[in-house]
């Protein structure tokens, strides 16, 4: 039969072909085995000759239910996108690694209150949360679906000293009221950061307590953020990272002095976790890991941020913006080549940064072995055995006294 003149003739476009491939993948994926355990990769030797605090940190974008749709992830069976199933799988993943500090991104407001917080409290955690800025303007029903950032900590090892919400939208107005590019590009994004100042407890120390009682309660500033997603706006992500480091520096300065003890700036520990939506060759990574970024960086090309950045720096002009936090990334691509793994995109965009002068990274978990993806034709995540489109980053650290 000749279909050349048939009005019902179907012309398959790229999206149609992708759906066909996804359907074929699902048919072939009826029988699967879970991935093997992720390998532990030591990065520094353990110091055992003096009192130390050893703790683990997880950073994990859990994928908001609002984004986990069959249209977006057609290669994942629908039942495994359902929150009732996926949420339990995410919690199993969190419990499996049993981290002492947990930073989660894309946590919905209602899910924090009714799912994440009660489940983690049952495992002796406490936590705080901040939704994206748009939640303030929405009805209660819609507000519950807004995602944000959460920080949890084990109460036997840490106590909360203070916390702070960082709203990039608000800071864009403060820093760039006379900058059209700041208002048009940064102000319109509602990403947030969350800061928590944690104090180590006596139970957190091994090999005996510190000789100096003042060393028992060491301060760690934990920052968690989720930067703007769109690759067309690298300048926005870089500005957001600059705003966040400025707020962290301000927090360091505010906790340095106490009635009992004056601390040096370098004695305050910093952990910066999150989904930065930025590759390692980005301005975000360069700025955070090296402590500086020239204003001539290509990501600023064509945009006049000069006045806004001068305001961010306290009114002093320089040809570069800097921060004094001395941060290092716990993970590198040689260890963890990707933290986001979807059909169209696979790369490292999540990071755990830490103070490199006073905190030693002992090791990190590597990736799910590529052989597993290849063996079962796994096109991307989420997946029946991988509940998010991101993998959790997990690192261990040691403080000494």
Annotated model-derived regions:
Residues 1-148, 241-242, 246, 250, ...:
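N-terminal, active-site-proximal structural segment of metallo-dependent hydrolase catalytic domains
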Residues 2-44, 188, 199-208, 232, ...:
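Metal-dependent phosphoester-hydrolase catalytic domains
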Residues 25-54, 101-229, 233, 313, ...:
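Structured beta-strand-rich core segments of catalytic domains in phosphoester-bond hydrolases
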Residues 60, 104-105, 225, 273-275:
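Active-site flanking residues adjacent to catalytic metal/cofactor-binding acidic residues
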Residues 63, 108, 228, 276-279:
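Catalytic metal-binding/acid-base residues of hydrolase active sites
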Residues 80-85, 187-190, 235-239, 386:
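Conserved phosphate-coordination/catalytic loops
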Residues 114-115, 235-239, 283:
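Generic recognition of short, well-ordered alpha-helical segments
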